[in-house]
Amino acid sequence: MTWFTPDVIDAIIAVVKAIVVLLAVVVCGALLSFIERRLLGWWQDRYGPNRVGPFGMFQIAADMLKMFFKEDWTPPFADKVIFTLAPVVAMSALLIAFAVIPITPTWGVADLNIGLLFFFAMAGLSVYAVLFAGWSSNNKFALLGSLRASAQTVSYEVFMGLALMGIVVQVGSFNMRDIVEYQAQNLWFIIPQFFGFCTFFIAGVAVTHRHPFDQPEAEQELADGYHIEYAGMKWGMFFVGEYIGIILISALLVTLFFGGWHGPFDILPSLAFFWFALKTAFFIMLFILLRASIPRPRYDQVMDFSWKFCLPLTLINLLVTAAIVLLNTPAGSVQ
């Protein structure tokens, strides 16, 4: 009797895939900080980081060494357990959310029938990390930043979910692979669900606290917000987690609205990973371009925009989509 039964082999393959995806996402998140600084320098007609190594390519290594050797300081007035737990929860929730994203027809950590719901569960968990960080720091700026962040995230997650319900109504499934295959047989959802795409993208920028929705950590107002008391590797986990969030939202946009691993007009279907990576990189660049080009609105304007514009738009989009699907459904199949 051998231990290497088909079930054991499948489990080993699943673990290896999970480790590879985990390492790739963390490395890409770290590299993205350097890429962002170089792109911002290029777009703003100035030099980016160019001192460490040729063309500044080793800047990320220098930053990692500096962060690794910094004192891992915990304020004496902080709640030490929750203070330490907050960055771990923040980064873990984002990494676990990648489990349901199908990268190619054969690559993906988990093929869940409730893939979209799993993503929203992990997104909701990240709110607790922000609250933990702000409250446990025992700092008024950190607490105010965490309250801003939690209110903003909860507000935008409401219509982030509603923006995707039009897709669920059309496909009839929460499974990510089913959504990708549906787009391969029909139009990419960027066309029939254009308003859903716009609102989901806006919500994605807001829940990752990226510019112009970075009020929770606005340096001019809150002195870096809810991670003002963090240093060393704890701060680094929040920092890299922000870029991992950008990659996650970009990958979701590609999966849900741009055909996933399929190329336009099914060009070169054998290059599934290339198409997925290319489209994801485009949206990552768009995130960075927003930081370089759009001013930051006031916090009350951000909240008004969420509840008074985006929420009604997503509800109208969902109602219209449901009506069209119902009218196109044969009478005998309606239960």
Swiss-Prot record:
Topology in the lipid bilayer: Multi-pass membrane protein
Organism: Pseudomonas savastanoi pv. phaseolicola (strain 1448A / Race 6) (Pseudomonas syringae pv. phaseolicola (strain 1448A / Race 6))
Annotated compartments: Cell inner membrane
GO terms for MF: NADH dehydrogenase activity; oxidoreductase activity, acting on NAD(P)H, quinone or similar compound as acceptor; quinone binding
Biological processes annotated in GO: aerobic respiration
One Pfam entry name: NADHdh
Annotated transmembrane regions: 12-32, 81-101, 114-134, 154-174, 187-207, 238-258, 270-290, 307-327
Reported function: NDH-1 shuttles electrons from NADH, via FMN and iron-sulfur (Fe-S) centers, to quinones in the respiratory chain. The immediate electron acceptor for the enzyme in this species is believed to be ubiquinone. Couples the redox reaction to proton translocation (for every two electrons transferred, four hydrogen ions are translocated across the cytoplasmic membrane), and thus conserves the redox energy in a proton gradient. This subunit may bind ubiquinone.
Cross-referenced HAMAP family: NDH1_NuoH
Source taxon at top rank: Bacteria
Gene Ontology cellular component terms for the protein in this record: plasma membrane
InterPro entries in UniProt: NADH_UbQ_OxRdtase_su1/FPO (IPR001694), NADH_UbQ_OxRdtase_su1_CS (IPR018086)
Reaction it catalyzes: a quinone + NADH + 5 H(+)(in) = a quinol + NAD(+) + 4 H(+)(out)
Family: Belongs to the complex I subunit 1 family.
EC number: 7.1.1.-
Name assigned to this protein: NADH-quinone oxidoreductase subunit H
Assembly: NDH-1 is composed of 13 different subunits. Subunits NuoA, H, J, K, L, M, N constitute the membrane sector of the complex.
NCBIfam families listed in its UniProt record: PRK06076.1-1, PRK06076.1-2
Record keywords: Cell inner membrane, Cell membrane, Membrane, NAD, Quinone, Translocase, Transmembrane, Transmembrane helix, Ubiquinone
